[in-house]
Amino acid sequence: MEIVAEGLGFPEGPVAMPNGDVVTVDVRGGRIMRTDANGTSQTLAVPGGGPNGAALGPDGALYVVNNGGFPWSVRNGITVPIDESGCSKPEGFTGGWVDRIDATTGAITRLFDGFDGQPFLGPNDIVFDK
């Protein structure tokens, strides 16, 4: 195993970009990170909440699913998505959403926050068929 990036709060959803960079979502940090071949990471976008899945769309943009965000605490040395009282659903929880993120500029466009009149309830991961 080789460590290729450090300083990411809770990385998920790695996406290999055409230029060789790897984009990950940082669930805990509410941000989208880009890591180059040298292991240098930088913030691409900060959608907030808990981004927890990404996919490269046919238009070259990143599509990111977001669970809405959760409180975090450390229990027995392990970071978990639960506050100190044991609650995993923060006050004001929105349920999550899907964003389109320009892979070059990091510009964020909110696309969906529900389906058929119902809000999302913590969506996780996203894929494209073609």
Regions found by a protein language model. Give the residues of each.
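Sequence-structural signature of mature extracellular/luminal beta-sheet repeat domains
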Residues: 1-130
